[in-house]
Amino acid sequence: MATVNGAVGKPQHISKMIESTKMNGNQAQDAAGRADTPVSSDTPDYLHVFDSRTCNIHHIPVSDGFVRGSDLSTIAAPVKGNSGRMQKLAVLDPGFQHTACKESGITFIDGEKGELRYRGVRIEDLFHDHDFDSTLHLLLWGRLPTNDEKIAFERRIFEAATPPQEVCDVIRKLPKNTDFISMFLTGLSTYMGADEEMTRSRHQAVMTYHKNMKATDDAIIRCFAYVSATLATVYCHVKGVELHPPKEGLTLVENFLHMIGMEDPDKKVSRTIDRLSINMADHELSCSTAAFLHVASSLTDPMTCLLTAISAASGPLHGGALEVCYQGLELIGSVENVPAYIAAVKAKKFRLFGYGHRVYKTQDPRAALTKELMEEHREAIAANPLLQIAVEIDRQANTDPYFVERKLKLNADFYGCFVYIAL
């Protein structure tokens, strides 16, 4: 007779377990029919799994719509050809499509409805009513800052935003036509080498950041400054212009523009970059986030984790999709070539970057916000000859059964490239 081996309770005969399940269900129905007997919402849920290899049934606890891998590993069966050895069940899930490596309250996405929230705040509200600095504060500490907190936060970033001479020197030694990501990572690595605390943390027995939230928060804030300052240094090197020192009293984006010498009297450019940055600030367990967390599990410093995340984000199926999407439009060449290109995509000869998403089964909510930015920069974007190609692709893909049936919709990358170029 088969038995039940579960994460909770002792093994039972199948017949007893089924009878028990029926009784519990009947009792719940009876209770629901009596107004004076509330049905407890704390009753645990279980996933009942029948293992045909052993004829055992396992009951796995279900909490908030997920099961724990450690509970699944209680399921085991004899190794073929070696009946004395048991092998625990493992889960193969390429791409983490159905797997979460940790619980988080940072970002929530409903891919069916097209909803995105940071710490419970709608992306649309952050986009329209807040700037990137406030969004960073929200992501880091779980709440939007007061005015005084925001000023203090920006001051701490400013204090770390002057690049050391060695950072400037190493970037300036690179040819100006060097790949951007290569220059960016080189500069950040040098910046990290100049941060004595981060460098020391990898060579001492007492963990600098483990269970030390103040040190961790301080290091993360320095990372914000390092990223902005390195971007400015790389930009100035490539363009052959002077790098200006940071200025107190400016936001992160405003200081970046100040450092590269860009005049922005009406703040139109800084506000656009702010909102583009809010759009891309976080997206649950993305490839780069997973890479960051893998490295962080070794208890290394935040910048080492960030370098790994940036490397992951540079790929064409992640952050690099923005550039590849634009190059794809250049490859098409003209509106007349769009039907042939769409046909090639459906024949799986080409990938249509900017369309479809692993999470969203309707329009990416960030895409609608990007269109708002396009409207603000309409004149500059309309002058781009590739825009009409993009519009025609969007029109055809929106009505073609191939895309409609597969729920392939516009994502944030498709039109985002036009806004960056317009700036």
Curated annotation (Swiss-Prot):
One of its GO terms (molecular function) is citrate (Si)-synthase activity. The keyword Transferase applies. The keyword Transferase applies. SUPFAM superfamilies: Citrate synthase. Pathway: Secondary metabolite biosynthesis. Pfam families: Citrate_synt (PF00285). It is an enzyme of class 2 (transferase). GO terms for biological process: carbohydrate metabolic process; tricarboxylic acid cycle. Its EC number is 2.3.3.-. One of its GO terms (cellular component) is mitochondrial matrix. Keywords: Transferase. The active site is at H357, D413. Gene3D superfamilies: Citrate Synthase, domain 1, Cytochrome P450-Terp, domain 2. Citrate synthase-like protein; part of the gene cluster that mediates the biosynthesis of squalestatin S1 (SQS1, also known as zaragozic acid A), a heavily oxidized fungal polyketide that offers potent cholesterol lowering activity by targeting squalene synthase (SS). SQS1 is composed of a 2,8-dioxobicyclic[3.2.1]octane-3,4,5-tricarboxyclic acid core that is connected to two lipophilic polyketide arms. Belongs to the citrate synthase family. PANTHER family: CITRATE SYNTHASE, CITRATE SYNTHASE, PEROXISOMAL. This is Citrate synthase-like protein clz17. It comes from Cochliobolus lunatus. The gene is clz17.
